[in-house]
């Protein structure tokens, strides 16, 4: 007697397509079956008038209404009470069987008395030649493995029959087996339901068969099975359901002894899998991972019920399903096959060596050695805005954390993010961190050439233009000015900018680029806070364009770029805003130094427009004495002209974008030169405009390359090389005075000193890093500048903008002022005792910068007399750093920060470290990410994709 088939059709209107539309096709497909169903029960989840109307007209024996939150497993359990046939057919609104499907499923079920259920081949709703699912298995650790999915159906899997499980959609099960197994497990959250049913069927002694000739089209609404991963919310929903099901099955299938330990391991495994998700460039799955872990922790009653069901129906051992599992070897072969099936690469070879990149870097090394030969023998860089770094790596990172600052009595606050950059640099040479800066200076030209060359690969694939891009970037006037003047933050910002462009321009494509760009963005902002507004504007513009042109695909990756930088700067931002000093956030980090730079007038801004940040025309004013220098700014004109032409070529979109970057850089430079937010002693110091010019130079060079790449007809190809050569020669001539400044003795760089304090103090500082020195510097106007320094030297990483930019005094300032006034006058107070109580061991009367005025000379002599007459002060003598006195009383240790400060510092550090670690994990490339990258062109926005 033919088996009676009772179909259960579950409808839930939560798909992208209206449920009624899919339901009509499914009902029509049921009506076209060569072997009709004997009964149909529809379970309508939710209130949808369209679904209700279609269901009422379907001829179903009953229509059950259920809440919208009802799962497929719960809906089938409701309908099972009405099942009277020999077999149950599980369907959803988006499962449309082909006419022969049921007949073939019933035939297979009738021919196999030991078969509990049979499963069809699932194909795409709109393409029956594409396999969605054909059999499911799992690894030894319970990971679900599709035996065939997302493949072109060529009959390659039609010989497969015995499987461990299948997708639940379209399954035809014997009614008695269905009831004895207890139906679907409601705790699986909609994933692995067919696999779990198959495992339980196998353990009961039954078999599970595939019927590859029975085709069922599915749309992936997510009513039954997992939703199609078409949108980010759906992908997160799939990840949550899959992980929840895996954890649930792991606890259900485990031996009784192992269940407790597996339950304890859920959270540690979630931590490990979080790291793996970041390494796999899937940060969107981190939250579903933790949601699934927490759900598994509290669903122990569901685990107990599921284990009871298995125990009551089990008739076979677990060893019998072992052959049906997927081995690690088979899994590797399957992954290799998936990798081989990826679309062919669209990206050509980099051609770093064959395209001249290596020769460019080698030439830059030669030029650097010739320009700065003495640096090879130096251990510490001095001059300009340079100072030594602290001697130990631990101190380097301590100075980068929230807490006591290296200046002042009890100044507690956030460190500048630049201190973290210096800590990274210093860690590269841990035995002598100051030497790391020397190495950076010596390697700056080749590093700039390398960065410029790689940045050029995002604009053009022509070797000659890439070479030109690297050369122009390494010879940028603002970069050479920073090198010869000793501006470490500006040098590092210039070295980092091309890599930010390289990664940031493709950040919307991949998490690898986004992670790398986020670290570089944070580092650039740390080195050049004045660039923050321009870079934020550029980032917001990129986000808007991505929303408009890519329908939001990749927006999360672009948003992430700003996250690490924002977290690193957050403590400083909060401090400056709380003290009403928002402008102080733009201050150049490091030593506040009033070095030569153009004035905030028309002539100065004209030089800025030519890319020149110094009034001496980057050294040309003194290079040829008596020779007019009006023509020097014109040497950069070829680059500017080519950049302006770029929007008129086929690469108009790239040209406009790069011109906008140029405009943002120039606006930053123009604004910076007229803004003073930091003070060197009592004198305001304007922001260095060179970092803005570096950004402008990046856009101008990129625009010039884009113009030469696509702005010439094929018959004029030779003109491209000529134009690139002219631009390079012009900038090279402009760079000659800077490159020869050390040989001519005009460079501000010096060999050290290893300490900014006298050798006596430096020696004491090596023994005790907390030794205190109060430094008194007479002013030419007759006053005195005073500051307290801790350790054997003032250090570059010990500088803090919260101190150099403050516009109002703090309590420790008043204390320093009182001590200074009492020290330099014949006061009767025990000021030396106060110094000792505060932890100060030395008093240094520093010389005033030449020329010394009569007022400052008189003040210095008067102060020396007063200090010599003080009891408790022992004159060490005159040194190159000034006159030094030692406190002879018992000096108390410097007051330490409170426990609450340490707790706050630890919390801030952990949050910042977490953001950096996430960015690092995202930035590490994997084999899969490299394959994905090769599918996209290296050049961003090529003309054949942009149009005109």
Positions of predicted regions on the chain:
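Active-site-adjacent helix/loop segment of glycosyltransferases
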Residues: 203-301
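Periplasmic/ER-lumenal interhelical loops and adjacent helix-loop junctions
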Residues: 402-405, 561-650, 755-756, 761-766, ...
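Membrane-embedded helix bundles of polyisoprenyl
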Residues: 215, 445-458, 464-548, 557-573, ...
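Active-site lumenal/periplasmic loops and adjacent helix-entry segments of GT-C-fold
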Residues: 373-506
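Extracytoplasmic
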Residues: 590, 732-948
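Conserved donor NDP-sugar-binding/catalytic core segment of glycosyltransferases
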Residues: 99-138
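Membrane-helix boundary/interfacial segments in multi-pass membrane proteins
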Residues: 382-395, 402-411, 479-491, 627-631, ...
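Short, acidic, metal-binding catalytic loop of nucleotide-sugar glycosyltransferases
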Residues: 28-37
């Amino acid at each position: 007697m033919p088996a009676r088939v009772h179909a259960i059709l579950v409808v839930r209107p939560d798909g992208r397509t209206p449920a009624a539309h899919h339901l009509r096709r499914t009902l029509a497909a049921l009506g076209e079956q060569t072997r009709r169903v004997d009964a149909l029960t529809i379970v309508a989840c939710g209130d949808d008038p369209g679904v209700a109307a279609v269901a009422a007209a379907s001829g179903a024996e009953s229509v059950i209404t259920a809440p919208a939150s009802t799962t497929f497993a719960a809906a089938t359990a409701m309908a099972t009470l009405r099942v009277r046939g020999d077999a149950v057919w599980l369907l959803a609104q988006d499962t449309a069987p082909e006419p022969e499907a049921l007949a073939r499923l019933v035939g297979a079920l009738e021919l196999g008395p030991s078969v509990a259920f049979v499963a069809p081949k699932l194909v795409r709703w709109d393409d029956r030649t594409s396999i969605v699912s054909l059999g499911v298995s799992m690894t030894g650790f319970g990971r679900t493995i599709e035996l065939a999915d997302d493949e072109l159906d060529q009959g390659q899997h039609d010989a497969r029959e015995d499987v461990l499980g299948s997708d639940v959609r379209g399954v035809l099960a014997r009614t008695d087996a269905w009831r004895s197994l207890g139906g679907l497990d409601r705790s699986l959250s909609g994933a692995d339901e067919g696999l779990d049913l198959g495992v339980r069927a196998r353990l009961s002694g039954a078999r599970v068969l595939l019927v590859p000739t029975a085709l069922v089209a599915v749309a992936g609404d997510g009513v039954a099975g997992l939703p199609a991963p078409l949108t980010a919310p759906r992908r997160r929903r799939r990840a949550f359901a899959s992980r929840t099901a895996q954890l649930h099955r792991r606890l259900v299938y485990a031996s009784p002894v192992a269940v407790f330990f597996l339950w304890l391991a859920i959270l540690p495994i979630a931590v490990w899998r979080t790291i793996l998700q970041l390494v796999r460039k899937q940060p969107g799955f981190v939250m579903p991972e933790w949601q699934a872990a927490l759900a598994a922790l509290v669903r122990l009653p569901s685990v107990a019920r599921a284990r009871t069901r298995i125990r009551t129906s089990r008739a076979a051992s677990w060893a019998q399903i072992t052959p049906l599992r997927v081995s690690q070897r088979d899994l590797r072969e399957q992954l290799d096959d998936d990798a081989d099936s990826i679309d062919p690469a669209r990206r050509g070879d980099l051609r770093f060596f064959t395209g001249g990149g290596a020769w460019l870097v080698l030439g830059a090394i030669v030029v650097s050695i010739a320009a700065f030969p003495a640096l090879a023998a130096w251990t510490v860089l001095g001059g300009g805005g340079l100072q030594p770094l602290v001697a130990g790596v631990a101190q380097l990172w301590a100075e980068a954390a929230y807490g006591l600052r290296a200046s002042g009595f009890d100044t507690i606050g956030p460190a500048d993010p630049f201190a973290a950059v210096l800590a990274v640099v210093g860690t590269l040479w841990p035995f002598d961190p100051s030497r790391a800066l020397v190495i950076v200076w010596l390697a700056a030209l080749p590093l700039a050439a390398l960065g410029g060359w790689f940045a050029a690969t995002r604009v053009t694939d022509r070797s000659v233009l890439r070479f030109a891009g690297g050369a122009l970037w390494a010879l940028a006037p603002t970069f050479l000015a920073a090198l010869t003047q000793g501006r470490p933050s500006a040098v590092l910002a210039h070295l980092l900018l091309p890599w930010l462009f390289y990664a940031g321009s493709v950040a919307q494509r991949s998490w690898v680029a986004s992670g790398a760009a986020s670290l570089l963005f944070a580092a650039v902002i740390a080195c050049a806070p004045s660039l923050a507004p321009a870079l934020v504007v550029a980032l917001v513009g990129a986000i808007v364009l991505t929303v408009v042109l890519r329908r939001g695909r990749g927006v999360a990756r672009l948003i992430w770029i700003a996250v690490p930088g924002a977290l690193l700067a957050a403590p400083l931002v909060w401090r400056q805003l709380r003290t009403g000093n928002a402008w102080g956030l733009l201050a150049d980090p490091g030593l506040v130094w009033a070095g030569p730079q153009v004035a905030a007038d028309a002539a100065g801004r004209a030089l800025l427009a030519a890319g020149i940040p110094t009034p001496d025309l980057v050294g040309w004013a003194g290079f040829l004495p008596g020779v007019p220098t009006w023509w020097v700014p014109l040497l950069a004109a070829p680059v500017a002209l080519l950049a302006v032409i770029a929007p008129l070529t086929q690469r108009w979109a790239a040209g406009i974008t790069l011109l906008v970057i140029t405009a943002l850089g120039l606006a930053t430079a123009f604004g910076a030169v007229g803004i003073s937010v930091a003070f060197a002693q009592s004198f305001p110091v304007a922001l260095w405009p060179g970092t803005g010019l570096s950004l402008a130079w990046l856009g101008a060079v990129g625009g010039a390359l884009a113009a030469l790449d696509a702005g010439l007809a094929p018959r004029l190809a030779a003109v491209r090389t000529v134009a690139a050569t002219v631009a390079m020669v012009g900038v090279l001539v402009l760079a000659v005075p800077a490159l020869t400044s050390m040989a001519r003795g005009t460079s501000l760089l010096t060999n050290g000193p290893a300490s900014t304090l006298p050798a006596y103090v430096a020696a004491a500082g090596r023994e005790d890093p907390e030794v205190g020195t109060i430094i008194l510097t007479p002013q030419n106007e007759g006053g005195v500048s005073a500051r307290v320094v801790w350790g054997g030297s003032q250090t570059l990483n010990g500088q803090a903008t919260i101190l150099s930019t403050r516009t109002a005094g703090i309590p420790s300032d008043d204390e320093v002022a009182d001590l200074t006034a009492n020290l330099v006058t014949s006061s009767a107070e025990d000021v030396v005792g106060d110094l000792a109580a505060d932890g100060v061991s030395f008093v240094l009367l520093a010389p005033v910068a030449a020329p010394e005025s009569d007022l400052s000379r008189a003040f210095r002599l008067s102060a020396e007399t007063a200090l010599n007459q003080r009891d408790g002060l022992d004159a060490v003598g005159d040194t190159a750093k000034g006159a030094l006195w030692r406190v002879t009383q018992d000096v108390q240790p410097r007051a330490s920060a409170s426990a609450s400060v340490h707790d706050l510092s630890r919390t801030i550090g952990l949050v910042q470290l977490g953001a950096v670690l996430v960015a690092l994990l995202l930035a590490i490339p994997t084999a899969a990410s490299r394959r994905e990258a090769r599918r996209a062109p290296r050049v961003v926005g090529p003309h054949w994709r942009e149009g005109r």
